[in-house]
């Protein structure tokens, strides 16, 4: 099993990413040695165990084992914007506390990696466009873009 933590600043699109993962979802298996936590979204797809933790929770000391149990950390950001203080704080925290865990960045709401994100070019970066708007607060990401991320994860971490 490969644990994939999905995190990012509030409003970056974590839930949109999780909601956009193809169905059917299988049951999430809670990793060993982590505290009880109510996860907004958690599911398994084949051997990939996805779970979502928002940035304020991820940087809380009590949840550090949830960060450390991940085999890969997917950090979602608003790709229309520059890396903001919330993203930078989260990224720096993850780098400091989980330096040996592979990280990928997903720039949400865009199809192009802007120059402002070049600081992070040592990491795999994906762009995810909006696929379908359900209502003013809910959307689904582009199926093709989600598939590209899943293909990458399956070929590198399964």
Please annotate each region the language model reported.
Residues 1-33:
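Conserved G1/Walker A P-loop phosphate-binding module
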Residues 12-13, 56-59, 79-84, 110-113, ...:
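Short acidic, S/G/P-rich loop/turn micro-motifs used as interaction or catalytic elements
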Residues 25-45, 50:
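Conserved substrate/cofactor phosphate-moiety recognition/catalytic segment
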Residues 42-46, 65-70, 95-99:
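Conserved catalytic network of the ASCE P-loop NTPase/AAA+ motor domain
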Residues 46-63:
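Switch II (G3) loop of P-loop NTPases
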Residues 60-81:
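Inter-motif core of Ras-like GTPase G domains
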Residues 73, 79-123:
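Conserved C-terminal guanine-recognition region of P-loop GTPase G domains, centered on the G4
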Residues 112-158:
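Canonical P-loop GTPase G-domain recognition
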């Amino acid at each position: 099993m490969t644990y994939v933590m999905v995190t990012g600043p509030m409003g970056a699109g974590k839930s949109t990413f999780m909601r956009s993962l193809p169905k059917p979802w299988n049951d999430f298996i809670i990793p060993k040695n982590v505290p009880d936590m109510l996860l907004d979204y958690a599911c398994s797809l084949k051997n990939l165990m996805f779970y979502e933790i928002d940035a304020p929770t991820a940087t809380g000391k009590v949840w550090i084992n949830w960060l450390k149990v991940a085999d890969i950390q997917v950090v979602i950001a608003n790709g229309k914007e520059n890396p903001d203080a919330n993203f930078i704080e989260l990224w720096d925290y993850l780098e400091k506390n989980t330096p040996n865990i592979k990280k990928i960045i997903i720039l949400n709401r865009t199809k192009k990696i802007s120059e402002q994100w070049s600081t992070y070019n040592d990491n795999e970066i994906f762009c995810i466009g909006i696929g379908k708007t359900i209502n003013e607060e809910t959307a689904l990401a582009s199926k093709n873009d989600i598939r590209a991320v899943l293909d990458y994860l399956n070929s590198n971490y399964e």
